Amino acid sequence: MSVISTLRDRATTTPSDEAFVFMDYDTKTGDQIDRMTWSQLYSRVTAVSAYLISYGRHADRRRTAAISAPQGLDYVAGFLGALCAGWTPVPLPEPLGSLRDKRTGLAVLDCAADVVLTTSQAETRVRATIATHGASVTTPVIALDTLDEPSGDNCDLDSQLSDWSSYLQYTSGSTANPRGVVLSMRNVTENVDQIIRNYFRHEGGAPRLPSSVVSWLPLYHDMGLMVGLFIPLFVGCPVILTSPEAFIRKPARWMQLLAKHQAPFSAAPNFAFDLAVAKTSEEDMAGLDLGHVNTIINGAEQVQPNTITKFLRRFRPYNLMPAAVKPSYGMAEAVVYLATTKAGSPPTSTEFDADSLARGHAELSTFETERATRLIRYHSDDKEPLLRIVDPDSNIELGPGRIGEIWIHGKNVSTGYHNADDALNRDKFQASIREASAGTPRSPWLRTGDLGFIVGDEFYIVGRMKDLIIQDGVNHYPDDIETTVKEFTGGRVAAFSVSDDGVEHLVIAAEVRTEHGPDKVTIMDFSTIKRLVVSALSKLHGLHVTDFLLVPPGALPKTTSGKISRAACAKQYGANKLQRVATFP
């Protein structure tokens, strides 16, 4: 079924069932709750659809509607309303006066948006953003909350029954060159089926589906859109939404919402699990039980085994089942999901010899191993999405334990980037494997840019190709380096290299977190941290650190999905724009 036909079916068969709930915390009048049933949602969607159909009635091409609005139910109605009208929706962040505003403006320009959908609250900021960053000042900006509900049914259902119906998902990478991934409704429905098959235990031949969804992830993000919109729509369960800001201000809200709703499904990046552990008190959890939680995905950034261990230990007293926590791997170029752990099994990890990993192949650590790297174990089988390890230079498939680029094949994979050069799209999305193993299609394959290896039905991720740090001819993975540094600094870390006359130099930038704040710590304390970090990297990794920066909490640049952007860190470092807490002798 298509997205819109599914919505129409929900509105017809279960019109009074709760569909979407938005928890708006910390407003001037206190916490507010906005609720919609399936029939109410369908009415709001058709209001948006009616406006867009009328606006684009004489168009000779498919129209595009960018959505740049606050997190909430208007965002949901805007996205679905554009699909319902046969338009191409483009989910984007709300302008908040930050660096990501440039990305929003450039994306509006890149997708040639015919209209921008927002709310009355954000309309002025949206107009200023698209005018400042190159989009036409004449692009109509429509406040979703001002549209009247029409009489009758305006959804162009037929437009939803083919692969042609699509949306653009802009990736959360560089702000200088935002790339819109073209995703069809077929891509989405395939990925939803893959998620249902791989995340939920099957009992009596049927999946044990969640009874609710809890999400604070931004709806403009690939994982936020899947968890906060597509999953509840196709499963037919209510979703409780709140904003990323509400979570950051009080991380305990996430655990509280999970405890208060029936068999919930949820997801978040790795850093959110660390925050939940550090910022959720016994008082916050008093009287709450997590024993009924269906699934919590840890994804969207590299999953750290220590984080999983600490999270399970912290919430074990509240009956959280280990098998409910699902480390996951995915990317926008394949809607979102690519791999997770085996259904019904708790998350596990394996220790490998770090020196062997640096040489390009995996060997289990032993009692004689000097340096070990612990990696999350994912499950790999012969069902789509297929995953193979390939030499990125020769395109030859690599054998068990050999580290290479992760390539993906499946019906959930996009056909390419919007407005991209044909050669780029062919190389990225239509790659061919040479000397493929039995049962492996020759093409088309998606090059992920990630490095990993396969052993049997186990799959491991070691890092990003572009972030690889090479020193003295040896490969070093930044995630491994950053894990070591965090043991001393406590905050988020970026390990990256800078080039000087063709020589690569390692730079470490670490957010310092102390009990009294960075302004209360002496230079002596900082010098001690630096000495310990430099010594550990030398002894454990054989690395020489050219520069070590301690920066205030929150100072490291991030992508729109909340991941530390190593490329942006390197760029700011080169321009001397990274704010230092202290300068070392």
UniProtKB/Swiss-Prot annotation:
Its EC number is 6.2.1.-. One of its GO terms (biological process) is lipid biosynthetic process. It comes from Mycobacterium tuberculosis (strain ATCC 25618 / H37Rv). It comes from the Bacteria. It is an enzyme of class 6 (ligase). Pathway: Lipid metabolism; fatty acid biosynthesis. Belongs to the ATP-dependent AMP-binding enzyme family. The gene is fadD30. Keywords: ATP-binding, Fatty acid metabolism, Ligase, Lipid metabolism, Nucleotide-binding. SUPFAM superfamilies: Acetyl-CoA synthetase-like. Catalyzes the activation of long-chain fatty acids as acyl-adenylates (acyl-AMP), which are then transferred to a multifunctional polyketide synthase (PKS) for further chain extension. This is Probable long-chain-fatty-acid--AMP ligase FadD30.
